[in-house]
């Protein structure tokens, strides 16, 4: 069996894991997440620990993947995930308008981004955006969508970048 699949998933206090024939749901203080249960992967719950096993040798790799997704779901409903973005450039600003995010990124018009359900956006400063939510995949997807409006360019580094991202700079053309 894969090394990832052998490791059990621990369930913190307040997190409830339900396994149905076609669906796996994780409920916690930050919400509820569901996952379609793949055929050939068995999930056994023993107290506050969930273990996964494969019914078929061809499903061993899938078992490791499902275990990683399940661990992220448990972490998401208990702690949540967040991704920070920074706006670099003169006149680049972000502001909240109710639940919508308004971005001034050098275009002739402000961009308005509507947060999907289950995702909260906040702007601690005019040049910072924080994306939070229980689903790791959706948090990353929303952050990537916002970054995609104006990705950082390599000459001056202007654009929307992840807080922990390092932009590799290029030297300007010599005359």
UniProtKB/Swiss-Prot annotation:
SUPFAM superfamilies in the cross-refs: Ribosomal protein L6 (SSF56053)
UniProt keyword RNA-binding, yes or no: yes
GO MF annotation: an example: rRNA binding
Gene3D superfamilies for the chain: Ribosomal protein L6, alpha-beta domain
A single GO cellular-component term on record: cytosolic large ribosomal subunit
InterPro entries (alphabetical): Ribosomal_uL6-like, Ribosomal_uL6-like_a/b-dom_sf, Ribosomal_uL6_a/b-dom, Ribosomal_uL6_bac-type, Ribosomal_uL6_CS
A Pfam family per the record: Ribosomal_L6
Key words, A-Z: Ribonucleoprotein, Ribosomal protein, RNA-binding, rRNA-binding
GO term, biological process aspect, one: cytoplasmic translation
Subunit structure: Part of the 50S ribosomal subunit.
Family note: Belongs to the universal ribosomal protein uL6 family.
Known function: This protein binds to the 23S rRNA, and is important in its secondary structure. It is located near the subunit interface in the base of the L7/L12 stalk, and near the tRNA binding site of the peptidyltransferase center.
Protein name, entry field: Large ribosomal subunit protein uL6
Gene that specifies this protein: rplF
């Amino acid at each position: 069996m894969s090394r990832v699949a052998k490791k059990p998933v621990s369930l913190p206090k307040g997190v409830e894991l339900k396994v149905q024939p076609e669906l796996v749901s994780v409920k916690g203080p930050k919400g509820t997440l569901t996952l379609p249960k793949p055929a050939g992967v068995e999930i056994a719950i023993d107290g506050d620990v969930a273990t996964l096993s494969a019914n078929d040798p061809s499903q061993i790799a899938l078992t490791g993947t499902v275990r990683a997704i399940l661990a992220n779901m448990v972490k998401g409903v208990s702690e949540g995930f967040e991704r920070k973005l920074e706006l670099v450039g003169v006149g680049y600003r972000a502001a909240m308008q109710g639940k919508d995010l308004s971005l001034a990124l050098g275009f002739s018009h402000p961009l308005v981004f509507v947060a999907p359900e289950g995702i909260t956006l906040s702007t601690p400063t005019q040049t910072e955006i924080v994306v939070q939510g229980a689903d790791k995949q959706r948090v990353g997807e929303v952050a990537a969508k916002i970054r995609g409006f104006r990705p950082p360019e390599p000459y001056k580094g202007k654009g929307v970048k992840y807080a922990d991202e390092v932009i590799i700079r290029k030297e300007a053309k010599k005359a």
